[in-house]
Amino acid sequence: MHRRLSFAVLLGLIIVLPLVAGGEKKLVLKVLVPEADAEIIVNGKTIEGEGTERKIEVEAAAKGQKVHIVTASWEPNNYTKFTRTRKVPIDSKGPVTVDLTKAYDTEKIKIRYVPTPDDVVAKMCQLGKVTKKDTVYDIGCGDGRMVIHAVEKFAAKRGVGIDLDEVRIKESKENAKKHKVEEKVEFRVGDALDIKDLSDASVVLLYMGDDVNLRLRPILQKTLKPGSRIVSHRFLMGDWKPQRTETFTGDDGDEYSIHLWVIGKKRKD
């Protein structure tokens, strides 16, 4: 009798255990990314694979975890790295589509630092017709050379440089002191995508990449005053065509292009 009971209990365990083990289903995510070679990280783990649409099975959530965190990073060019993150609730019923092809407020863009040669900076200031009446902004200012040059060589009234990298901002401030223009320039840490108002600027200098220029475009068009000038080294702004483009050979023998946009009169709706 005892042996029969033990066998029955054992048989019950054999039947129940697979049900328990198989009862915890993995969540299936369909992740959409803008680039086939984008890196995808789910809950801190890199997921191998390629393609703009990927099917990913998510492991069971850790204790206390309320969301699955899905991050994608990619580099559309040698200058720019995009990172986008989405959160998927733990109790979601799969499959869940995670669309990382669209930009949201959580998007981060990192620009590789490549300084603009001094002679190109001078050409940009000339194209933008910088004068003593101007307040010049450089978004993604790096070592600060653009606004320093605008103030020192073109007598701009004021210069403002913004960069995400604290090290570059520190370097910019040191360079301003070396050139003895620290009283006329301001450098601050900031994300280009967080800028909401550029109405203080009369000239904006850029070397940021096509993607970032395109995201800045609505702010530039909406907040800059009529007559304000935008000068971009190399990169454009989608279908907003520049009024003028200059191509020239730099002191280093390389060819450079700079583009000018002038803000027109605002329409009254």
Residue ranges and their predicted role:
Residues I169-D200:
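S-adenosyl-L-methionine
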Residues D211-D269:
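C-terminal substrate-binding/active-site "lid" region of AdoMet-derived donor-dependent transferases
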